[in-house]
């Protein structure tokens, strides 16, 4: 086997592992978002929607709701920052472990919807530090607007004769989030408030799986320091 062929095989395997991780984390995000929406009434990973909802609430005179949503936006930003700091200080998998702990804390906050809302958003921000790219291609985990946009632009270029098909992977986060949201809705219907324990356990299992990924591959899933 030539060196070049070996490198291609390793790259293909590394990309497959990265995409599987992206799909799993997006599934986790979709599940958490659906549970948050159905149990609290607001999105916990869709910040574009929360931005619009905050603006509408303020204009309609609902200052309390508007400020809560703005607080959620701030929490999402801080969660991203915390996730990156943990990822750099330790390993990207540590961010997943942190998210699992945050989700468990949120599950314990029964009767405190505002605190649970902010905690869930912070967790969804932090999870984005787990995977930022696949072989140099940016991917989103807890939001799919950008992924669908990149998919659409890639489709347009392909229709115009550009045969680079790397854009196809952008559909993976959407599929993961869609499937996860269905699961989250089913969990709320069947288990009510207990549903939130499932994302916490799922994040813990994801952490265990992520620790099996070779360390030398991990640098390909996050932006350079």
From Swiss-Prot:
Residue ranges that the Swiss-Prot or TrEMBL entry lists as coiled coil: none
Q: Where in the cell is it found?
A: Cell membrane
Keywords from UniProt, A to Z, are: Cell membrane, Membrane, Plasmid, Transmembrane, Transmembrane helix
Transmembrane as UniProt keyword: yes
Question: What are the GO cellular component annotations?
Answer: plasma membrane
Write down a Pfam family by its short name: DUF1275
* Highest taxon, organism lineage: Bacteria
Q: How does it sit in the membrane?
A: Multi-pass membrane protein
Task: Give the residue spans that cross the bilayer.
Answer: 17-37, 66-86, 95-115, 117-137, 168-188, 194-214
Assign the protein's first listed, main location to one coarse class. membrane
Keyword Cytoplasm attached: no
Q: Which InterPro entries match?
A: DUF1275
Family assignment from sequence similarity: Belongs to the UPF0700 family.
- Which PANTHER family would you find in this protein's record? SLR0142 PROTEIN (PTHR37314), UPF0700 TRANSMEMBRANE PROTEIN YOAK (PTHR37314:SF4)
Which protein are we looking at? UPF0700 transmembrane protein RA0705
- Look up and give the organism this protein is from: Rhizobium meliloti (strain 1021) (Ensifer meliloti)
| Lineage summary | Bacteria, Pseudomonadati, Pseudomonadota, Alphaproteobacteria, Hyphomicrobiales
């Amino acid at each position: 086997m030539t060196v070049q062929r070996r490198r291609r095989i390793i790259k293909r395997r590394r990309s497959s592992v990265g995409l599987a991780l992206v799909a799993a984390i997006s599934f986790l995000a979709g599940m958490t978002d659906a549970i948050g929406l159905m149990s609290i009434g607001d999105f916990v990973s869709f910040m574009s929607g929360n931005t619009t909802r905050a603006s509408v609430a303020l204009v309609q005179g609902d200052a309390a709701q508007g400020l809560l949503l703005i607080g959620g936006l701030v929490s999402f930003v801080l969660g991203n920052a915390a996730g990156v700091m943990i990822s750099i200080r330790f390993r990207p998998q540590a961010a997943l472990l942190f998210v699992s702990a945050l989700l468990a804390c949120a599950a314990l906050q029964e009767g405190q919807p505002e605190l649970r809302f902010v905690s869930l958003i912070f967790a969804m921000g932090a999870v984005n530090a787990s995977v930022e790219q696949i072989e140099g291609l940016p991917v989103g985990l807890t939001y799919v607007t950008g992924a669908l946009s990149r998919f659409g632009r890639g489709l347009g270029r392909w229709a115009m004769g550009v045969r680079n098909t790397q854009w196809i992977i952008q559909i993976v986060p959407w599929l993961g989030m869609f499937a996860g949201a269905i699961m989250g809705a089913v969990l709320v219907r069947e288990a009510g408030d207990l549903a939130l324990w499932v994302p916490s356990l799922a994040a813990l299992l994801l952490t265990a799986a992520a620790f099996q990924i070779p360390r030398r591959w991990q640098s390909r899933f996050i932006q350079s320091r």
